[in-house]
Amino acid sequence: MDPTQNTSAGIGGSNGTIRYQTNDGTSTVTVADDSKENLSQVINSIEKTLGVLHQLHLTVTSFTPASQLHLLQRLNSLVMELDNMTKLSEKCNIQIPMEVLNLIDDGKNPDEFTKDVLNSCIARNQVTKGKTDAFKDLRKHILEELEQNFPDEVDMYREIRASSAAVTKRLAQSQSVLPNGDAKVKNEL
């Protein structure tokens, strides 16, 4: 292959995007940027459609036989913009929960749904934290009881735990793994 040709290679980017870089060092648009651009185009089309609907409303409310041509032009403009919006929306893949759509249909604020979801997550997190704390307290209590009755075995247990933790920590550092199990990722800019 001729080295002067521009071939593309996919390079992993941050936050789940794919960045393509050519041999000459230039990079093309990311996948996330494409979806943002598509969404922006759909939003602009919706705004244009709303503007055309407003103009159509004004034309209809002040309709006279002489303004019939103007009304037909506005209707054609609305049909063209709705067609454009449909074509643009096919490029967007956005999933909206049915609960949000039902709230909108009921005339309620969809932010309430988001607030309720966050509050339920916080509540479940608190329950999980409570369970974790209860297990920590139980472990601490059992170790205290065992230490009173079997001090030598508890000392051996603590030595084994300490050496095991040290080995795990060294292994994690050598493999670039965070203590919580996540892998370290180098940012590519």
Swiss-Prot record:
The record's Gene Ontology biological-process terms are: regulation of transcription by RNA polymerase II
What are the entry keywords? Nucleus, Transcription, Transcription regulation
- Return one GO MF term: transcription coregulator activity
Q: What is its main location?
A: nucleus
Highest rank taxon of the organism = Eukaryota
Pfam families per UniProt: Med10
Please give the GO cellular component terms listed in this UniProt entry.
mediator complex
Q: Where in the cell is it found?
A: Nucleus
Q: How does it assemble?
A: Component of the Mediator complex.
Output this protein's name.
Mediator of RNA polymerase II transcription subunit 10b
The organism of origin for this protein:
Arabidopsis thaliana
The UniProt gene name for this protein comes to: MED10B
